[in-house]
Amino acid sequence: MEQKFKATKKAGLLGIFGNLFLLIIKGFIGFYTNSQSMIADAINSASDIIASLMTFIGNKISSEPKDDTHNFGHGKAEYIFSLFISITMMGLSLKLLIDSILRLINQTTFNYSVFLIIICLVTIITKLCLFIYTHRLYKKYDNILLKSNAEDHRNDCLLTTLTLISIISGHFFGIYYVDGIVGLLISLWIFVSGLKIFIESYNILMDISIDPKTKADIIALVKRHENVLNCINFYAIPIGYDYVLIFTIEVDGQMTTYDSHKLAEHLEKEISNHEKIEKVIIHVDPV
């Protein structure tokens, strides 16, 4: 667990400094050449800095151990900050959407510079490296903040490729409206990406139940025990990445209290070995 928090912290810091570098160079060249797609890319980098900063802060809070007032730890902090990230992304995308539409209406052109192409290539390489690194960490630790950042880096590679296409089409083929269209596409992409993160974070914060397959597997495991007649009133409460399970097992009414509680204790230990389960609470109902 400690390694996961350290890895997420490192990924957050790399994202902050990498995106800050890209924001500065893209913002300068974008305003200098009046390229809406490059300005859009710079705004996207600004949102990426916020996302990486939220990753860093959220990871720090969620790594705090359990205490008297937070009995199950601080795992949901990651989802709270992921929610902030998504709202920021969607807000910036709406601003960018309006600017791009106005640019298409006004038929604004941009001033070509070879630096536009150079910065696009630098961005693609930088973001590709950040994506590969962060995606590997996400696969290893299954962290929503790492997942959000990895998807963000991947999207940036594709979006900057679109920016590069708009620059080439505008300068070499005289199709300047592509610049505004690409800005429009980038804004929509950012919004959709933010919406996906928002929904995932919202579901956890609203105590969405465990996935149906895992639930079915656990109930099947419980019912396989010869002394369990049925498994009812199954509840799964998320506490960050893991879940607290509460359910009732029906046992033979002739079974002693001692034996029924030993059975419940055995099942609790067995189920707690599952990677998604933090704690299991079983109520015994003699029938």
Question: Where are the predicted features?
Answer:
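Alpha-helical transmembrane segments and adjacent TM-loop junctions that form the membrane-embedded core
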Residues: 2-18, 22-25, 32-33, 37-43, ...
